[in-house]
Amino acid sequence: MDNFKAVNDTLGHMFGDEVLRHVASEIRRKVRTSDIVGRVGGDEFIVFLRNIRSLDAISKKAGEICAAFKSKYSEAIPHGGISCSVGIALYPGDGACYEDLMYKADQALYAAKEKGKNCFAFYDVTFRNRAFPSVLSEVESGV
């Protein structure tokens, strides 16, 4: 989730937890029952989509998931609400194990945030060993 720290800081953790539950529910409604949705921790979610063969279909689903973050709480949330950035890694092309796919999805996530947040990016081999300075500075400053 983009800018979620501001929600907890300004509206409190109880409100933030309610937003997380709502967003999780909305994500689940955007995917099939055979897909897997989980919260990795903090403000990060993971979605495993099975048997989607077209990049267009994956892009459409990523857009639907981003739309799920247009929360019913948007008016209460400062600075225009929350949004999400999505990093996408494909099995088996980007990796054959969970760790490889997570690492590459994370690299794609950083690329999506670099594009301006509230969007998605597919992993690309050019991301390997690439530094993402603004994201790294956010992490270092605790944002």
Feature map (PLM): residue ranges:
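ATP/adenylate-binding site constellation spanning eukaryotic-like Ser/Thr protein kinases
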Residues: M1, G42, K117, V125
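Conserved long alpha-helical elements within nucleotide-processing catalytic cores of c-di-GMP signaling
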Residues: D2-R32, G38-G42, I46-V47, R53-G63, ...
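Residue-level recognition of strand-loop junctions within catalytic nucleotide-signaling folds
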Residues: D9, F48-R53, K70, Y91-P92, ...
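Histidine kinase transmitter module recognition
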Residues: R29, K72-A76, A112
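Glycine-rich ATP-lid/hinge loop adjacent to the conserved G-boxes
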Residues: D35-I36, Y73
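Cyclic nucleotide signaling catalytic output domains
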Residues: V37, E64, A68, P78, ...
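HATPase_c (GHKL) ATP-binding subdomain of two-component histidine kinases
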Residues: V47, I82-C84
